[in-house]
Amino acid sequence: MAHTKKGGSSRNGRDSESKRLGVKKFGGEAVLAGNIIVRQRGTKWHPGANVGLGKDHTIFATVNGSVSFRTKANGRTYVSVNPIAEAAE
């Protein structure tokens, strides 16, 4: 009796959703307080002056200013925000 054999079952076709990690604001860019600068797993970049570190290691600005990245002698890269001088009104 003619019939079609059972089709194969693929064991592929799964992947995790991307987490959109990485640098969101680059060196020299202006940021506002609360802006996310880096999303990361672990501390590839370390917090410097005027930034905070979230519980998921996200680095964010605590003041308005411009972003700067600096590698120190210990080999660690630190992210800081240089505050903008407020104009006196």
UniProtKB/Swiss-Prot annotation:
Key words of the record: Ribonucleoprotein, Ribosomal protein
GO MF, one term, reads:
structural constituent of ribosome
**Keyword Ion transport set for record:** no
Q: One of this protein's GO BP terms?
A: translation
| Gene3D superfamilies recorded | 2.40.50.100
Residue ranges for the region (Disordered) are 1-22
Any GO CC annotation of this UniProt entry: cytosolic large ribosomal subunit
Q: Which family does it belong to?
A: Belongs to the bacterial ribosomal protein bL27 family.
Looking up NCBIfam families in the UniProt record yields: L27 (TIGR00062)
Instruction: Write down what this protein is called.
Output: Large ribosomal subunit protein bL27
What species does this protein belong to?
Brucella melitensis biotype 1 (strain ATCC 23456 / CCUG 17765 / NCTC 10094 / 16M)
- Source taxonomy: Bacteria, Pseudomonadati, Pseudomonadota, Alphaproteobacteria, Hyphomicrobiales
